[in-house]
Regions:
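Conserved RecA-like ASCE P-loop NTPase motor core of nucleic-acid helicases/translocases
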Residues: 50-54
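Peripheral, non-AAA+ core regions of ATP-driven protein-machinery
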Residues: 1-12, 17-25, 30-37, 46-49, ...
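Conserved Walker A/P-loop ATP-binding site and its immediately adjacent core
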Residues: 55-62
Length: 384
């Protein structure tokens, strides 16, 4: 059944599966409760009764938050309770189609002596809620706390038990949020959902590429656009590099949003194959907007951005760069080229530098695609 939140449905694999147990984690204040409250109201209007159980707020507080978000649904039932036996009794009495428990760390079983949030309580409560979902055929959503390292708090057995594990990510001081699946028995784990946090709650972002590029500087050295592929969704991202002389012995390598080891490998290839001396340079690489991009198709963009920053030579503003780079400096083929180029063309880009081996003879692409075989060739073409 559809949740009424298209971005959530995309990540879940097309919609909410009756009888499924979904765990959603994220940093405090990131918007987990807001997302599930909005989804609960939409589900209540579309599919029938939803029981929203809050162990962290009173029913009056949840009601106030729902009113502030402009949510109205007569079938949305709010319960402030932490004892699981009482929650089960309310489920039996109200017979909801969907149950939301916010959060699993606040719920406890009365016949266990340990405190709520302990390993035994989380494990046993998770097992009971799984049984409730399967026997009654209701979809159950659990909110989970995370540790300082960003992993879900509690026993790992909980993640093995549930059908789907979602992470809600983003910078607390930024406006956008990304919902990712790291486990999904009913769909792909490659899809993402993008939201924007506003005064009226979370707003879906159907075109995240435009949002990520909204503040892109034009004519700046070290800035390169690439088209990432998250599942079936293409995303245009700005990869930035800053190369400066090192003043303290060992040069620094700082990476945000990309894979650190891969960036170090690309810098070594730049020095060996393209003759750019980086051993005395600090290099900082960032995926703008706090996004993440760890696929090999970003290799060429990272390398070109570093070369651009080193030489203080900006790229043309209407070009996107795609390709995997091998240790010998060759540019390797990537998948989903046409999908990526179509997204770039839709946002006004007219040129693309891509692996020559990815181009199909006679194919008609939505923009001018130039093939390259080596990193040195790409750098010569783009930054001279």
């Amino acid at each position: 059944m559809h949740s009424g939140v298209a971005e959530l449905d995309r990540v879940l694999g097309g919609g909410v599966v009756p009888g499924s147990l979904v765990l959603i984690g994220g940093d405090p204040g990131i918007g987990k409760s807001t997302l599930l409250l909005q989804a609960s109201a939409a589900l209540a209007r579309a599919a029938g009764p939803v029981l929203y159980v809050s162990g962290e707020e009173s029913a009056a507080q949840v009601k106030l938050r729902a009113e502030r978000l402009g949510l109205a649904a007569s079938e949305l039932l709010i319960l402030a309770e932490t004892q699981l036996e009482t929650i089960e009794a309310h489920v039996g009495a109200s017979e909801p189609r969907t149950l939301v428990v916010d959060s699993i760390q606040t719920v406890y079983l009365g016949d266990l002596e340990s405190a709520p949030g302990s390993v035994s309580q989380v494990r046993e409560c998770g097992g009971r809620l799984m049984g409730l979902a399967k026997t009654r055929g209701i979809a159950v959503f659990l909110v989970g706390h995370v540790t300082k390292e960003g992993a879900l708090a509690g026993p790992r057995v909980l993640e093995h038990l549930v059908d789907t594990v979602l992470y809600f990510e983003g910078e607390r001081h930024a406006t956008y949020r990304v919902l990712r699946a790291v486990k999904n028995r009913f769909g792909s784990t490659n899809e993402i959902g993008v939201f924007e946090m506003t005064d009226g709650g979370l707003r879906e972002v159907p075109n995240p590429s435009a949002m990520f590029l909204a503040e892109r500087p034009h004519g700046a050295a070290g800035s390169v656009i690439m088209a990432a592929l998250e599942g079936t969704r293409p995303l245009l991202l700005e990869l930035q590099a800053l190369v400066t002389p090192a003043h303290f012995g060992t040069p620094r390598r700082t990476v945000l949003g990309a894979e650190y080891n891969r960036v170090c490998l690309l810098l070594a290839i730049l020095e060996k194959r393209a003759g750019i001396p980086l051993q005395s340079q600090d290099v900082f690489v960032n995926v703008a907007g706090g996004a993440r991009c760890q696929e090999p198709a970003a290799d060429l963009a990272i390398a070109v951005a570093s070369a651009s920053s080193y030489g203080e030579r900006p790229l043309a503003p209407d070009v996107v760069v795609l390709g995997e780079v091998g240790l010998t400096g060759e540019v390797r083929a990537i998948g989903g080229l046409e999908t990526r180029l179509r997204e770039a063309a839709a946002l006004g880009f007219t040129q693309a530098v891509v692996p020559r081996s990815s181009l199909v003879a006679g194919a008609r692409y939505p923009l001018t695609a130039t093939g390259v075989s080596t990193l040195e060739e790409a750098i010569g073409l783009l930054v001279g």
